[in-house]
């Protein structure tokens, strides 16, 4: 899980979603997991 100020999609499988007020990226590739913070 990377914590970044600006999250963006890295590949076409990445999905940007909001979870309890936080913007996160989920993907089939675990290296692409990101959270805004």
UniProtKB/Swiss-Prot annotation:
<dbReference type="GO" id="GO:0005840">
    <property type="term" value="C:ribosome"/>
</dbReference>
<protein>
    <recommendedName>
        <fullName>Large ribosomal subunit protein bL36c</fullName>
    </recommendedName>
</protein>
<dbReference type="InterPro" id="IPR035977">
    <property type="entry name" value="Ribosomal_bL36_sp"/>
</dbReference>
<dbReference type="GO" id="GO:0009507">
    <property type="term" value="C:chloroplast"/>
</dbReference>
<keyword id="KW-0934">Plastid</keyword>
<dbReference type="Pfam" id="PF00444">
    <property type="entry name" value="Ribosomal_L36"/>
</dbReference>
<keyword id="KW-0687">Ribonucleoprotein</keyword>
<dbReference type="GO" id="GO:1990904">
    <property type="term" value="C:ribonucleoprotein complex"/>
</dbReference>
<keyword id="KW-0689">Ribosomal protein</keyword>
<dbReference type="InterPro" id="IPR000473">
    <property type="entry name" value="Ribosomal_bL36"/>
</dbReference>
<keyword id="KW-0150">Chloroplast</keyword>
<dbReference type="GO" id="GO:0003735">
    <property type="term" value="F:structural constituent of ribosome"/>
</dbReference>
<dbReference type="GO" id="GO:0006412">
    <property type="term" value="P:translation"/>
</dbReference>
<comment type="similarity">
    <text>Belongs to the bacterial ribosomal protein bL36 family.</text>
</comment>
């Amino acid at each position: 899980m990377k914590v970044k100020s600006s999250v963006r999609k890295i590949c076409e499988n990445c999905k940007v979603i909001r979870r309890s007020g936080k913007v996160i990226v989920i993907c089939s590739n675990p290296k692409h997991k990101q959270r805004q913070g």
